[in-house]
A protein has these predicted regions:
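Detector for methionine-enriched segments
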Residues: 1, 121-122, 186, 224, ...
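Classical eukaryotic N-terminal signal peptides for Sec-dependent ER targeting/secretion
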Residues: 1-9
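Non-catalytic terminal accessory segments
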Residues: 7, 14-47, 64-67, 77, ...
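Acidic, metal/ion-coordinating pockets
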Residues: 19-312
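A generic signature of intrinsically disordered, low-complexity regions enriched in glycine/proline
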Residues: 55, 101, 312-315, 327-329, ...
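Short, solvent-exposed aromatic-acidic interface loops
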Residues: 196-198, 239, 315-336
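Compact beta-rich and alpha/beta scaffold cores in large eukaryotic transport/transcription complexes
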Residues: 234, 256, 285-289, 299-301, ...
Length: 602
């Protein structure tokens, strides 16, 4: 009798160690007795957001991030007013990626159609785009015409290395190449530039030039440094959608090296994004870079005292990562105003909160599709844990993939998905329409190829040794955190009075987070995970030459073919290289639909 063994595996590709985690959302509300760390006001103060990805309506299952966009706008408006009253300057900045990740942005077409209007109600002083504004032509058109060229932001939108393609094919700058302005209080003369990382998947309505190529080969930059001389500039702001820490490409550091040649003594402040982490890097004695997390979990705050009273040549930098919640907002406003009863809401903020709530109801995002009986984590539980989301998908979800035509019960199969298709932890509670957009927003088509078992059994390992498989999922951030040195410098926090959350280590140490949290351990995520079904009692009893199905997302086809052909050649098998002609449509529900169906039973 043939028995079916479902053996769903996830490979750690040798990365089986865990390390303290700075990127996990809180599970419990913090104790009201936990003292927060203050922000420090300087000559120039910055409020920074990045990678909000449509999270304008707060985190409904996480108390530590219970503020919505209206609460945030009110916080910024009141904070700005109080800092200006102290005769200090405030600059509010965003560095892109405003869609793909939440129903408020993604339940419309194009994504961001309605959420962009709400996002733009924040009075940003400087803003730019991210790669998620460029995946489709519709998104690029919406961003360019609705934000970049809007009357509110036309003089504040900077994008130094991206061009928009008009209907007639004309190429125009997506935003200003640079802008200059003078701060209202301290009268600091500011030069601002912005760069998107070397993104090569833009649509046919946008062109991205790699930052270094833009700087070294385009005439505008040379004209800028000739007309905006160092003696005429007090501060340079370089903000953009690229990581503060990137050991592989080091684009931020290379940009800094080039700009520093022309402005050797000017204070240069960078603001980054893309890799979804809290980070702060000191580039030299007069330059730092702040990166402020993701998903409206973090408000980045930075201050600069332009001259140190002891050392007039060195500015003083101070950073703080503020948890995106009402209590934190109230705390910082009350400390700044020396008034525990300081108002934390405004008429404008309440209007925005109402608009967010109305949009949620209009898009039916609260529609209950099922129930999640426990919380599942992407990376803060080991891959073999029943609390790990990939473990759930490979053991409980993918085995339910039954296509109407190509399923052969007697045929062994390997079902592979890229881990980037899963965007967020899955929290205990109602499984709603919004949950789908948050955790797994993208539909997929299944393809398959027939290969010998000896080849199929090696595909996962091969892919997990290679580069990140491109998708619209979250960017892989593990290689961007190598500079933390395993977080060995900062203690692992385990305090019963604290909730789990961000415990960030950066170039300034271990106390950048405004709210103390317990540390979590992060387990590295491979490129792919797989569900393996071998139709034998034991896999080792199976004939290695027996043909099996390898099933995968359609956009992974070239990666799969590369893996299969390399394995065939390495094993010396007498087979010709396989091509796209050897791949076929498999059919069946998307992983998104399979996930919904699974939780509908609860």
């Amino acid at each position: 009798m043939i028995l079916k063994l479902v053996h769903c595996l996830v490979a750690l590709t040798g990365l089986i160690f865990a390390k303290p985690y700075q990127q996990q959302q809180a599970v419990l509300a913090p104790s009201q007795d936990v003292p927060l760390r203050d922000i420090h006001i300087g000559d120039i103060n910055f409020i920074h957001t990045t990678d909000t990805h449509g999270w304008l309506g707060s985190h409904l299952s996480q108390n530590d991030y219970d503020a919505d966009w209206g609460d945030f706008v009110a916080f910024v408006d009141i904070l700005r007013e109080k800092i200006l009253q102290q005769s200090r300057d405030v600059i509010v900045i965003d560095t892109g990626d405003k869609r793909d990740g939440n129903g408020l942005s993604d339940a419309t077409w194009p994504p961001g159609l309605r959420s962009s209007e709400i996002f733009n109600m924040m009075d940003y002083d400087l803003l730019t785009l991210g790669n998620h504004e460029l995946y489709t032509a519709e998104s690029a058109i919406l961003e360019y015409r609705g934000t970049s060229q809007s009357s509110k932001f036309k003089d504040k939108y900077v994008c130094s290395n991206v061009e928009f393609i008009e209907d007639d094919g004309t190429r125009v700058p997506f935003g200003n190449k640079y802008i200059t302005f003078e701060t209202p209080i301290m009268k600091q003369r500011v030069l601002a530039l912005s760069f998107l990382f070397s993104f090569q998947r833009a649509n046919n309505r946008a062109i991205v030039t790699p930052p270094l190529e833009e700087i070294t080969q385009k005439s505008w930059f040379q004209n800028m440094v000739e007309t905006k001389r160092e003696e005429e500039i007090d501060l340079i702001i370089v903000f953009g959608h690229l990581p503060a820490t990137d050991p592989t490409e080091r684009e931020m550091h290379k940009i800094h090296a080039l700009i520093r040649k022309y402005y050797p003594n000017t204070v240069i402040q960078y603001f980054g994004g893309h890799t979804h982490i809290r980070d702060f890097v000191q580039l030299d004695s007069k330059s730092t870079c702040l990166q402020s997390g993701r998903f409206a979990e973090t408000v980045g705050f930075l201050s600069i005292n332009m001259t140190d009273p002891v050392d007039a040549e060195s500015p003083i930098f101070s950073r703080r990562y503020i948890d995106f919640n009402k209590e934190a907002f109230k705390y910082h406003l009350s400390k700044l105003g020396h008034d525990s009863n300081v108002p934390v809401s405004t008429k404008k903020g309440k209007t925005i909160s109402r608009l967010v709530n109305d949009l949620r109801h209009e898009l039916n995002l609260n529609e209950k599709l099922g129930y999640i009986p426990q919380t599942y984590y992407v990376s803060t539980r080991p891959l073999n844990s029943e609390e790990n989301l990939y473990h759930l998908i490979t053991h409980k979800i993918l085995p339910n993939l039954i296509p109407p035509k190509n399923y052969e019960p007697s045929m062994s199969r390997f079902i592979l998905i890229n881990t980037g298709s899963v965007r967020y932890d899955l929290y205990k509670g109602p499984f709603t329409k919004d949950t789908e957009y948050i955790v797994m927003p993208f539909n997929n088509d299944w393809r398959f190829i027939t290969v010998p078992l000896v080849v199929a059994s090696r595909v996962e390992t091969y892919l997990n040794k290679g580069p990140v498989i491109a998708s619209l999922g979250i960017p892989s951030s593990s290689h961007h955190k190598q500079h933390f040195g395993g977080f060995q410098k900062c203690p692992f926090i385990n305090n019963p009075n604290l909730s789990e959350g961000y415990t960030t280590e950066d170039d300034f140490g271990c106390h950048g987070d405004d709210t103390p949290h317990n540390s979590q351990r992060e387990y590295d995520i491979p490129n792919v995970v797989q569900c393996k079904e071998v139709k034998k009692v034991q896999e080792e009893e199976a004939d290695p030459s027996k043909m099996v199905h390898v099933i995968f997302y359609s956009f992974m086809e070239l990666d799969i073919l590369n893996a299969v052909n390399s394995i065939i050649n390495d094993l010396g098998l007498r087979m010709e290289n396989l091509t796209t002609n050897d791949c076929s449509h498999y059919g069946g529900d998307s992983t998104k639909k399979l996930l919904r169906d699974y939780f509908s039973q609860f």
